């Protein structure tokens, strides 16, 4: 899902980190293929939004240390230079467990402060989840593999796994040269699915809208019957990008073992509140800040949209921030059956913006979206669920490919790559082969 809304008063919605690696180049190639190069708004490596990220701890915004100098000196809220945590990490033995929670892994290798402040906040910002429950192997596979392969996170990340073949385009070369850290599109991220729709339909691809799938059944010839309420269609192969728990309800009885594995992949809800202020200024310049669970159980973090993309501030321009609400606070509200009103989320977001950023005046505009069960949670042992699903699909030779956020990455970047790999696998597999 890409949520973005472009209004005269400004663009509200997603922006994507442009992190180094294969997924970056695959995504850059897609943007070029869709003819969107001229619409890209990059954040270059020397921009404040690329260099500055903050933690909100004890009522204070602290800049996360960057560069060697930042690692060598004390950087509150950490009591000691992070250099010592890195040095300590080099001496730690390799873990022996097949999986481990993010908190346990970080505490064992980097110490309690990094675990309870940095990794706790990171898990809330990326997964809206609890670092004491999420799997290091599935949520941060590069860290897990670094320890397994090189006995050290730092050594593993420094030595890397070698360079893989990378696509090339003028946009990708520009991104490399300018060290892009994130990007958006001039008309908002909604331009991406819109351009993809145009690209596909112009090539004869049928896109069905407003027709939810009500069931999947296997026919005697090995093809799928896809039920769509009052109608149906037949398919040689199905690529499913719906949440795993949703797919588990659609599968036929013959796929009960697969359905059981998928049903256990749960997801959490997140409320996203976009606020715009006239004549306001931020106390700091950067990408935004994260909030550890010990500080505020409701607020996951706040993104400073106007710092990265002032081009989208609208006319007349106004300061835009995005407040993300969730975590244990929202889970308790859902469990208790409380009324989850827009007023509740707006009040909570405005209070956070006032307390954490000093934005005490009422916003000129506010948009509230509650995304139910939108971010899958890769709990301890998630990798075993994927292995079980993969083994069942192979053994039964089902013409079904799993893709999307439920499996190996929740970011838009991960989902794009997941879809690409699913298409490659489906095209290389003959029906009933």
PLM features per residue range, with description:
Residues 1-12:
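Glycine-rich FAD pyrophosphate-binding loop
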Residues 10-18, 256, 383-384:
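Short glycine/proline- and charge-enriched loop/turn segments
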Residues 12-94:
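Dinucleotide-binding Rossmann-like beta1-alpha1 core, especially the glycine-rich loop
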Residues 41-42, 258-263, 388-389:
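Short, P/G- and charge-enriched loop/turn segments at secondary-structure junctions
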Residues 49-51, 60, 70-72, 81-218, ...:
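Active-site/ligand-binding neighborhood in enzyme catalytic cores
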Residues 209-335, 343, 352-356:
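Mid-domain catalytic core of redox enzymes
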